[in-house]
Amino acid sequence: MEKFAFVLHPLSLEDMQMVSPFVRYVPDFLLEYILKNKKPFTVSHITGVKSPYAEAEGWFVGCPLTAKQMVELPEEFVIDRIVETGKIAEELGAKILGLGAFTSIVGDAGITIADRLNIAVTSGNSYTVATALEGTREATRLMGKDLREAEVAIVGASGSIGSACARILSREVRHINLIARRIGPLEELAQELNGQGAATFSVSSDIKSGLHKADVVIAVTSAVDFIIDPADLKSGAVVCDVARPRNVSRNVSRNVSALRNDVLVIEGGVIHVPGDVDFRFDFGFPPKTCFACMAETMILALEGRYENFTLGRNLLPSQIDTISGLAEKHGFSLAGFRNFEHAITREMIEKIKHNANLSR
């Protein structure tokens, strides 16, 4: 039996308030104080992860800090708390630890955390990229668009996931607008990729203006708050929101939204897990499905590949190819489209496509 663990943490205080009615009556400042001082803990025992080649069990381990706290508290304090969480995984018998959400971007993106633990560590970003691009390609096709002729915007292009998406898509699309807060890293990336594929490049630090012409948007920044609003998007746009917390305003993807019912927003990396998996914890997905970052941890465990796989901010296409091959071997696959915990049906996509055609 292979063994893994994965770190969860509350993305916001609202997450905590949804879990417990009692918490709703606790003032925000007091709740932040409680979370800052609460020790990491075991969330649940995961069973039933089974491929034709191996079987695994695992654990969700909880780091109580919110995304906002991980950004604002001293880096050393946050890393110490994540390492404490990892030590629980070690004690449980896990041989590899996946870093969820903001735990994968603090400091040097997992390198220091891995150095301080006695088990392998991965951020899950390789499979996150692979499945985000797979989902984007399929969603673009269903919306009647030719990805080869599309203008793509990558929000958060200077980060590890964003730059990896740019490297892969540079061989597949016509134009890529690289968007992030700082222009310098974007210009370096554009210069590196220019001429490697068919795509031309532009760079921007202004998200609103950078999105108006985009047929396809991949949102991968680590912003704590929403940064994309309905008015920013082109009619008929396909938006893949990979980041946690989500980059796309709930107004965009609320069912049958009166504001923008002509835009398709999908969550990146919703994965079907082989076997009869029971997570014993509800994170808003249908049974037997999970985030791609969680899936990468399970895939590596099933393969017995207990090594630091995806760490740091340089994500290589070869890593993405490797994890994609292992995922296929063990029976992991994209589990359709979802947004804000709701399934997106073919009928819904056709309606969005129809609305976009009417607005032209």
What role is predicted for each listed range?
Residues 129, 159-165, 225-227:
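Short glycine/serine/threonine-rich phosphate/pyrophosphate-binding segments
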Residues 138-216:
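Glycine-rich phosphate/diphosphate-binding loop of Rossmann-like nucleotide-binding domains
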Residues 198-273:
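Rossmann-like adenosine-cofactor binding region
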Residues 104-108, 183-188, 247-250:
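Short, charged/polar "capping" segments at the starts of alpha-helices
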Residues 48-147, 279-288, 295:
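Glycine/serine-rich phosphate-binding loop and adjoining beta1-alpha1 elements at the start
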Residues 2, 6-12, 17-57, 64-67, ...:
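Adenosine-phosphate binding glycine-rich loop
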Residues 101-104, 126-127, 181, 244, ...:
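Short, ordered loop/turn segments at secondary-structure junctions
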Residues 3-5, 95, 174, 215, ...:
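Conserved acidic residues
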